[in-house]
Regions:
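Alpha-helical scaffold segments
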Residues: 2-412
Length: 412
């Protein structure tokens, strides 16, 4: 029989928990939204951090924003109730690591302008990294004495082209590497980067990064695709803008890693993918199964590879419509190993709904245990003829209900 407590007894029990300063117990209290004002005064920084994570009171967040503990700062910034006013207080925190967290997370341009003048360079580094930082601030930071700050400016997709052009003449190799990585770096800058004088090893690394940049000219695409250096061919084969005709050439490369990049590149046409499948190589087939533009016509060939990982990868490829996969389920309904594998790893509602009606109890057990199985399907499975299926379905539904209640409590 459950013992009942009076309100006074419950109050005493909670007060004793607070006094014991047990973080696990206090986390439960704080998560429910209780006693935040009292808990935030604790001398234990872990308990104050718990309040910073769960409170919906902006006044409490403002008070905690002066705390120098980095975990408290992170929890405040991750709290959905954190306002720009709270961020402004954090931006003046005496702990530079707290200020750098603000610089990394905020989207407020006034705060970013303020932190761009911070006395600690690693705070400025985070400002340079933030894509919400205004271009004029990034331009100013591109002249910073620390190459680490200039490197972040060179990486930032919000950096203006004329600023990127200036950084082309930077003496530090790391800044040039960052320029090569930036998806906003123009074709013209990339071509001039190729002319930079560096050590042989550094030049190779720079060229690899350039080969992956989507803004390559047609000439550079051809140059990298024909390079005697396999790492350059491997890099350009992964480029999201490489033309299909060059991928067709690279599909015949003698290096397996080059062909694998061709196999999973979205620009590779059906004919080239079909050619690669003829290799009957497990790794190549796995890469094809991940291709976002995998043609449905190739599915029968892929399934013939008969490897569990490939099967589940295909069924989780979000670009393949359900209508392309449901016939496969129907055709291989009696292949228990295949069906069991799909039931265990699939994240598709339509597939799991179909498999919930499978004759095999082991398949239905796996479906009921799959976190992607729709709630409506689990509700039906509560009445399954198999005790184990019913038990798992009930447990899943209970866990989801608990999770929903916790989410609702946080939103309140």
């Amino acid at each position: 029989m459950t013992e009942k407590y009076s309100n006074e007894q419950l109050e005493m029990l909670i007060q004793s928990i607070i006094e014991s300063e047990n973080p696990s117990a206090l986390a439960i209290i704080a998560e429910q939204g209780f006693y935040h004002e009292q808990l935030m005064m604790s001398e234990n920084e872990h308990i104050r951090a718990i309040v910073a994570k769960y409170t919906d009171n902006v006044k409490f967040l403002k008070a905690l924003a002066t705390d120098t503990d980095i975990n408290i700062c992170k929890n405040i910034l991750n709290n959905s109730n954190c306002t720009h006013e709270v961020e402004e207080i954090l931006a003046q925190n005496s702990n530079p690591y707290c200020r750098s967290e603000v610089a990394k997370k905020t989207n407020n341009q006034d705060i970013l302008r303020y932190l761009a003048k911070d006395k600690d360079w690693w705070v400025q580094c985070k400002v340079a990294e933030n894509e919400k930082t205004p271009p004029d601030v990034l331009d100013e930071l591109s002249k910073h004495i620390k190459w680490e700050v200039r490197e972040e400016v060179a990486k930032n997709a919000s950096t203006a082209e004329d600023t990127l052009e200036t950084l082309l003449f930077d003496k530090e190799d790391e800044v040039c590497f960052a320029l090569a990585l930036n998806i906003r770096t123009s074709t013209s800058i990339l071509e001039r980067l190729m002319e930079k004088k560096m050590s042989t090893q550094d030049k190779r690394e720079l060229c690899i990064l350039i080969a992956m940049n989507p803004n390559l000219s047609e000439e550079l695409f051809k140059q990298f695709a024909k390079s005697p250096d396999y790492r350059l061919r491997e890099a350009v084969a992964s480029n999201e803008n490489i033309p299909a005709n060059l991928l067709s050439v690279l599909a015949r490369d003698n290096r397996n890693d080059v062909r694998m990049n061709v196999a999973c590149n979205k620009n590779t046409d059906a004919k080239t993918l079909d050619f690669l499948l003829e290799e009957k190589d497990f790794l190549i087939a796995s890469a094809i199964a991940r291709n976002p533009n995998l043609p449905i016509d190739l599915l029968p060939k892929l399934f013939k590879v008969n490897v569990r990982l490939i099967d589940s990868t295909i069924f989780n490829n979000s670009q393949i419509p359900d209508k392309g996969l449901l016939p496969v389920i129907k055709e291989r309904w009696d292949d228990i190993d295949f069906i069991y594998n799909i039931a265990e790893y699939s994240n598709r509602a339509a597939i799991l709904t179909a498999l919930a009606k499978h004759e095999s109890q082991s398949v239905r057990c796996v479906v009921s245990n799959n976190s992607n199985t729709p709630t409506a399907v689990l509700t039906e499975m509560k009445n399954d003829v198999c005790d184990t299926v019913r038990y798992i379905a009930n447990r899943q539904l209970e866990n989801r209900a608990i999770k929903e209640r916790k989410t609702a409590a946080k939103e309140r």
